[in-house]
From Swiss-Prot:
Organism, as annotated: Macaca mulatta (Rhesus macaque)
Cellular-component GO terms for this entry: extracellular space
Assigned protein family: Belongs to the GnRH family.
Residue numbers marked as site, Cleavage: 8-13, 15-16
Disulfide cysteine pairs (residue numbers): none
Glycine amide: residues carrying this PTM: 15
Keyword Oxidoreductase: no
Signal peptide: 1-5
InterPro entries: GnRH (IPR002012), Gonadoliberin (IPR019792), Gonadoliberin_I_precursor (IPR004079)
Role according to the record: Stimulates the secretion of gonadotropins; it stimulates the secretion of both luteinizing and follicle-stimulating hormones.
Protein name, entry field: Progonadoliberin-1
Annotated PANTHER family: GONADOLIBERIN, PROGONADOLIBERIN-1
Residues bearing PTM Pyrrolidone carboxylic acid: 6
Amino acid sequence: EGCSSQHWSYGLRPGGKRDAENLMDSFQEIVKEVGQLAETQHFECTMHQPRSPLQDLKGALESLIEE
């Protein structure tokens, strides 16, 4: 017999269903965490770098929250 597991994070419930009441909170938490990661990357390197994929992800999540 195989073993299965469920990853629980950001409001996920067993079976992959999301808790609709907490979905916006989850998105806002993700945006905050991505922003913190992007800030860390910004300060660690003094060389000019192209736009970070994390910044793009943050922008996409923020636009979803605004809709």
